Amino acid sequence: MNERGMLVDPRFDAFFKLEQIDDYKYDGADTSPSTSNGLPETSNGGRLICDVCGDVAFGKHYGINACNGCKGFFRRSVWSRRQYSCRFGGDCPVVKEHRNVCRSCRLKKCFEVGMNPDSVQNERDRNAKNGGMGGPMSSPTQSSLCKELTISNGQIKRKRLRPETVEKTTQTDGKLEINDDFDFENMQQNPTPPGLLPLKIERISTPPSDLPVPMDFSIHSAVLDIEQKVFYNCPVAVDNSINATKTPITLPFEVVFRQPHLVCNRYPMRFSNTRVLTPEDLIDGWRRHFTYYSDWCHAMDEFKALSPEDQIVLAKKKIILHGWLVHAYYSYKSGCNGICFANGAAHLPEGGHPSITEFYKECMPRYLNYVIYPMHNFQMDDAEMVLIKCIMFFSSESGLSAAGRQIVSAAREKYLSALYNYGRANKCTTSAQATLRIAKFMIMLSAITSLTHLMNEGVHVTSLFNIIEFDELIQATHKTTPPQHSPPAPMG
């Protein structure tokens, strides 16, 4: 039995010997960047857990139990004096599955749990003395300097002090003190003090200019204003649209999308349960939504920035998704446990028109359970609805030109960030809750996608057997996704 009073497997002997050695101390702080190659277990058999991200830790690094990933991240950040910024309010969760998502919050967590930046510099100085292993090469003068790093107003500041006893080969003064409190904003005017290595300044995760910064809450107001203007764009005061329902529309989508008044007048929309939905009401409600959808698309700046060809591809692909979302939301707002249309007709789970009941037979259970119920559960409001609608509309880039894909991708990121910011400010107390809320909304959108496929099949079958006489425009719109653009063949 060894001096610990227990038997030690020879394979782990090096591990226990390493643990017996006192860590290198600097001003009383634990500075050992442990590289223990034994098992990551405590003396009582439990596994060491990284204090930063919760991953498995293999010993103490810079004063805390840390995994190799967080150890390396902290070392690189301190050595290079990197400065990060957070897009999401500065309190992102730091867990092992997503620890690389926000470097700003990860570095902040490193300091909060007690990682010692002095330990990083001591390791660097020792490596420099031993030939530069583990860090950039330094001169004897530079390696004899010690650093003290502090955090002030979100900036990393560094101070180097030269000890009174210096090597004879480099001594020119009795004592030398160097201060280099850098102002990152005015660094160009402040030259690097003598004896210091050039510093690498790196700003990471700064949102581009076309994306909202964390405190920009104007985006949801802008799209909400568009929604209200389009919704209440009602030059026709009297609802006489039912009289024209039986007139078939044979014009192609590309034509009527630019001239939606050819499909339906812009009569006032009232999503309510005033009468039982009939096949005529269904067709009329579909047409009123078509006009509303066209007006909304043409009011969006990102949509107007697309080429005419990309506009048609995107509009045709998203019209049914848009229809399910807005009909569900305005039905939820009206308190109807079913689906309401703009003409005041509604279909409920029970007691509907036989043809309509057959048409919605497959859709209604999913619609109520995975769309209407989540809206009630989340207490979704108008701002969230319009932002989710934008995310859904700009969620796909297939079939678009290269320029169109770039516009759609930027728009999606813009509205996704805006939805997070709105939820973080108005619905949730932590960033984790806001992220979870968005994830649940995305699940709801996947249910709407499923409903779209079911309805496309329903329109096809219903038209085939003449259960409901849909015109050519409706049938064409509910067919498969429009053809996608193929990249041009290489010349030669």
UniProtKB/Swiss-Prot annotation:
A zinc finger (NR C4-type) spans 50-70, 86-110. Orphan nuclear receptor. InterPro entries: C.elegans_NHRs, HNF4-like_DBD, NHR-like_dom_sf, Nucl_hrmn_rcpt_lig-bd, Nuclear_hrmn_rcpt, Znf_hrmn_rcpt, Znf_NHR/GATA. The gene is nhr-4. Residues 47-122 bind DNA. GO terms for cellular component: nucleus. GO terms for biological process: regulation of DNA-templated transcription. Pfam families: Hormone_recep (PF00104), zf-C4 (PF00105). Its main location: nucleus. GO terms for molecular function: DNA-binding transcription factor activity; RNA polymerase II cis-regulatory region sequence-specific DNA binding; zinc ion binding. Residues 121-143 are annotated as: Disordered. Residues 215-481 form the NR LBD domain. Coiled coil: none annotated. This is Nuclear hormone receptor family member nhr-4. It comes from Caenorhabditis elegans. PROSITE patterns: NR_LBD, NUCLEAR_REC_DBD_1, NUCLEAR_REC_DBD_2. The keyword Cell division does not apply. Keywords: DNA-binding, Metal-binding, Nucleus, Receptor, Transcription, Transcription regulation, Zinc, Zinc-finger. Belongs to the nuclear hormone receptor family. It is found in: Nucleus.
